């Protein structure tokens, strides 16, 4: 029994390590942490002024301008993929090896030996061929559309915003989780304080579900282990 476990356990561990689901880290990019935050210019308003500086100046747009301000992100992501591969190989090999039973000498003796060799020639011939043909194709279309409110976490020294937001929904026992982070330019924010996801640099978008539907569509771990270690 111990010998069986000794041979089986390594394959089981390998299978478990090879069946880990893809993960995405929502940690900010390194440069976001390295860049110093933009220094705010706090200018005191003149006494009695009607147009003093504040969080919402009179003639400013109602857009995110400061840390902790909200920005609505319109997520419109679609991917289209189509691949096709063909491979064909062929190899033929023929080998001949032969030799006379008698060799050497010259003149009359050589002629006599050649006649003997013509009737007593020994040798062998091999023929081998190998053919392989493979064809594969794949097509995939996916789209994901939703909106999510994010918060300005940091204003970088160049004026760009690092935003982050999440949303969780629980509907009939099925939990939906949406997380988003990335870097945006304030100039790309629309007049209605929204921005399209295509303008987000280093965007990380996570969407996952937890519940009965997710468990029913997930492969059992035993099947994943067998598929990972099965060599054929």
Curated annotation (Swiss-Prot):
Pfam families per UniProt: FlgH (PF02107)
Residue numbers with lipid attached (S-diacylglycerol cysteine): 16
Gene Ontology CC annotation, any one: bacterial-type flagellum basal body, distal rod, L ring
Domain of life: Bacteria
GO MF annotation: an example: cytoskeletal motor activity
InterPro entries: Flag_Lring
Membrane topology: Lipid-anchor
Protein location: Cell outer membrane; Bacterial flagellum basal body
Lipidation (N-palmitoyl cysteine): 16
Coiled coil region boundaries: none
Segment forming the signal sequence: 1-15
A biological process term (GO) from this entry: bacterial-type flagellum-dependent cell motility
Alphabetically ordered keywords of this record: Bacterial flagellum, Cell outer membrane, Lipoprotein, Membrane, Palmitate, Signal
Function according to Swiss-Prot or TrEMBL: Assembles around the rod to form the L-ring and probably protects the motor/basal body from shearing forces during rotation.
HAMAP family linked: FlgH
Family listed: Belongs to the FlgH family.
Oligomeric form and interacting partners: The basal body constitutes a major portion of the flagellar organelle and consists of four rings (L,P,S, and M) mounted on a central rod.
Protein's name in the database: Flagellar L-ring protein
Organism, scientific name: Campylobacter jejuni subsp. jejuni serotype O:2 (strain ATCC 700819 / NCTC 11168)
